[in-house]
Amino acid sequence: MNAWEVNFDGLVGLTHHYAGLSFGNEASTRHRFQVSNPRLAAKQGLLKMKKLAGAGFPQAVIPPHERPFIPVLRQLGFSGSDEQVLEKVARQAPHWLSSVSSASPMWVANAATIAPSADTLDGKVHLTVANLNNKFHRSLEAPVTESLLKAIFNDEEKFSVHSALPQVALLGDEGAANHNRLGGHYGEPGMQIFVYGREEGNDTRPSRYPARQTREASEAVARLNQVNPQQVIFAQQNPDVIDQGVFHNDVIAVSNRQVLFCHQQAFARQSQLLANLRARVNGFMAIEVPATQVSVSDAVSTYLFNSQLLSRDDGSMVLVLPQECREHAGVWRYLNELLAADNPISELKVFDLRESMANGGGPACLRLRVVLTEEERRAVNPAVMMNDTLFNALNDWVDRYYRDRLTAADLADPQLLREGREALDTLTQLLDLGSVYPFQREGGGNG
């Protein structure tokens, strides 16, 4: 059956700022307290969506979350009106204000794990929301992510959206950023690789930085998504690269159809994994980047593997990269050698995503891949599908509501909260989503 990969990109939120909230993510830590530009961040992401859609790659958008998120501050003991809550937390515990204002939902590779209908026992597309419980600011995302996905994939005959796993460390789940799918054409059954960093009773784990994904979580997600057990491989990420800042597998590997593009040190027992894939995936091709050509450190600083590998109709592939790859002489030299070599990659597309990159999120972080048949694609909420009309509407929306300068101190401004709610209220109408945000359900919005 014919099917396509649709990339659902996260729209950067109005409170995009640099707070260094993500231990283990070296870019996040390095850019802590810098002044951010939310308007530019959103426009950089939108431009990527527009250009890829214009090049013939199906593209859609997932909206940002409500931030600052006042309900959590109330859970933490701050009381009064919304404005009073903001004032109290800014004065008494400003670190909480930064956490509940994070624009991290823009990295929708962590929103959920997807199983296309060709891989599932019931023939539906399954989406399991990630609990993201390794980081407080990200653990807040799951309920609204679930509401958004249910508003986008709202045909229950074709889509099943599952709630996140219980919020405990044993079941730490980071979504599609730790998941790859390999196979032939998108509509054919594929092999799903669930990548984890730790498991109970296994001493092979990182020592410097946390392993956010557990094998126990990966197994549970595979069950929830009803993936055919014959089409699942569980693979451990190399703990040494986690300790070098590879906090998700999509920082060290990316797959598309029959190709796995990865660093030679990406996985524990890598040669064994690749042999398994060669035996189980027709035409499997591993493009392993040697450490002698690109070190793990350079891969992390340029986000070489946090790229998108996209298929053209003729079977050739395009590698979508951040600007940082072009600016690194060694990485750019390797990429040009890759283009000349015998593999399906025939074009490099480079995007300036500096605002997101400075918080540790490249092209792959910003997108959630969903393989859909034509019938399934028609069942998706059409208002979120990217085209010139939607791009222009969203670009105007960003110009109207987003600030071009934001510091941590600005997060306490009650006007920022009001601007954000008004913006999201308008956006839910633009994208035909209904009332998906808590402030709307409490009677504060018109969505």
UniProtKB/Swiss-Prot annotation:
| Gene Ontology MF terms | N-succinylarginine dihydrolase activity
Using the UniProt record, name the top-level EC class of this enzyme in a single word: hydrolase
Per the record, a Pfam family?
Answer: AstB
Question: What are the positions of the active site?
Answer: E174, H248, C365 (nucleophile)
- Describe the reaction catalysed, as an equation: N(2)-succinyl-L-arginine + 2 H2O + 2 H(+) = N(2)-succinyl-L-ornithine + 2 NH4(+) + CO2
> By its UniProt entry, which InterPro entries does this protein fall under?
AstB_sf, SuccinylArg_d-Hdrlase_AstB
**What EC number(s) does the entry state?**
3.5.3.23
In terms of PANTHER family, this protein maps to: N-SUCCINYLARGININE DIHYDROLASE (PTHR30420:SF2)
Name the chain's protein: N-succinylarginine dihydrolase
Q: From which source organism is this entry? A: Escherichia coli O6:H1 (strain CFT073 / ATCC 700928 / UPEC)
Taxonomic lineage is:
Bacteria, Pseudomonadati, Pseudomonadota, Gammaproteobacteria, Enterobacterales
Question: What gene is behind this protein?
Answer: astB
